[in-house]
Amino acid sequence: MQSVTECYSKVKKDCFRYIASQETRTEKFKNKDKMIKSFLIPVSFYIANRANKEKTMIVGLAGGQGTGKTTISSIIKMILEKYFKFNVFKISIDDFYKTRKERLKLSKNIHPLLMTRGVPGTHLSLIHI
């Protein structure tokens, strides 16, 4: 029987390393142990228990800008790969933003708000991909 404790012992170093890479000097994650043990690992178990080797599973994560979607999905991906030995592909809206240089040009030529990621018009269109 797989357990949260067993999983935590196998993934904690990688999780903490990833979290450290996301922290800044002024913004630190609080309650990292609790976040991993009480939320991220149980969610990973939930996903793993519903996975079917015959079909591709798609899991979506929604939330506002800066709410931790990338951090959460990256750590869950890490847990699913390392502990459950799943093949995981993660994609983020961040992967489809125009470059900073492109957004700067748009902000000068069209509107200053286009410098900010997330504003309509700052994503690559399917034609450009």
Question: Which functions belong to the PLM regions below?
Answer:
Residues T70:
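Walker A/P-loop
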Residues I127-I129:
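Conserved small/polar residues in nucleotide/adenosyl-binding loops
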Residues F84-K98:
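Short beta-strand-centered segment that lines the nucleotide-binding/catalytic pocket of NTP-utilizing
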Residues T67:
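ATP-binding Walker
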Residues G64:
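P-loop (Walker A) phosphate-binding loop of NTP-binding proteins
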Residues M1-K37:
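Charged, amphipathic alpha-helical linker segments immediately N-terminal to NTP-binding catalytic cores
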Residues P42-N52:
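Pre-Walker A adenine-sensing motif
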